[in-house]
Structures are given as C-alpha cells and as structure tokens.
C-alpha cells in the first residue's frame, strides 16, 4: 500500500472516522456488507462507486431493506425520498475527493449526500477508490471541477436524455465548468 494511502487512512482515523483499505472490488464489497446489519434500512446517494463494487445489486438481491431511488418514477417524488433517506439506519455514499488530511469533499446537486452525512443516519459509510485521494482542499476542488463534474455531467445527460419528452430542453452549467447539460429527445 502506498504511503499516500496509509497517511490518508491514518488521517481519517484521527478525524474520528473508521477507515478500511480493500485490495479489490470484492474485498470492498465484503467489508461494506459486514458493516450493515441485515435488518437495517439502507439508503444511498447516487454513486458510480457503489454500483461498480456490486453493492447496490447485493443490497437488492440479498434481502436488505434497501430504499432505491431508481424506483422513483415521478421526479416530483425525489424531495420526499431524499428526506426519507435521512431516517434510514445506514446511508451509503462516495465522496468527490478525500484529502490526505482526512477531509471528505463533496459537491451535490441535490445536497442529499451532504445532508445525510451531516444530519442523517447514525451510520454513514463512504466508499471511495484511491483515485479520489488528493493532497488538500484546493486539489479536491480542482478534482471536482476537472474530473468529477465533467464525468457526472456526461452520465446525467444520458439519464436526462432518456427521460425528457419532445420539446423539453434542459440546460445547466455544472459548477462553472463550461460543460452544459443539454438534454432533448425526439420520440420520432
């Protein structure tokens, strides 16, 4: 394990967080599942990391009480769902960046992850790859602007494009990146 990773793990612990290191996706999945009681209610923020390690599928397919926002069909129901998520026993998320000083850096469009981390469930589990480790808060902000926001913009543009109706146009500049989400779809 690299010195940077070790320093970051120790800094997270010094900041009163439990910190674990996993060699691979399966080990990460097993570690997270070991931290969740089977009878706990579980909610999560939108996170590719959680999907990539197989956590969302494991929760859905192995009897966990997982509250899945993908089940929401009407966008008007999202605010109520986000509020409900704050009452779950466990909240799962990732972070946009983690500093070597053990600081979690998050920028959210809906503030659901940040709200859950600060005011939500007693148990919040953050799953993040070592690619998210940065030196300090300045590098964290830069990572959001140059890596996380552009990737999320592309991912969310595809999702939005699949849900809009003819004539709908959605334009949003994400974090001043100059990358606009423009979603429109013709049903023809």
Q: Language-model features: where?
A:
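Conserved phosphate- and dinucleotide-binding cores of soluble alpha/beta proteins
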Residues: 86-188
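N-terminal active-site beta-alpha-beta segment that forms phosphate/nucleotide-binding
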Residues: 2-82, 87-92
């Amino acid at each position: 394990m690299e010195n940077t990773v070790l320093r970051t793990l120790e800094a997270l612990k010094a900041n009163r967080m439990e910190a674990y290191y996993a060699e691979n996706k399966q080990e990460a999945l097993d570690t997270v599942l070991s931290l969740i009681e089977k009878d706990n209610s579980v909610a999560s923020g939108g996170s590719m990391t959680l999907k990539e390690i197989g956590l969302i599928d494991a929760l859905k397919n192995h009897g966990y009480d997982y509250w899945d926002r993908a089940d929401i069909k009407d966008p008007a129901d999202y605010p109520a769902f986000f509020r409900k998520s704050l009452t779950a026993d466990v909240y799962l998320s990732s972070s946009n960046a983690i500093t070597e000083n053990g600081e979690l850096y998050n920028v959210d469009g809906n503030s659901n992850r940040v709200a859950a981390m600060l005011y939500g469930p007693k148990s919040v589990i953050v799953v993040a790859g070592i690619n998210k480790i940065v030196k300090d808060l300045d590098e964290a902000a830069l990572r959001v602007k140059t890596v996380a926001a552009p990737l999320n913009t592309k991912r969310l543009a595809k999702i939005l494009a699949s849900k809009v109706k003819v004539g709908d146009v959605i334009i949003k500049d994400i974090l001043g990146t100059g990358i606009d989400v423009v979603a429109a779809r013709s049903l023809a």
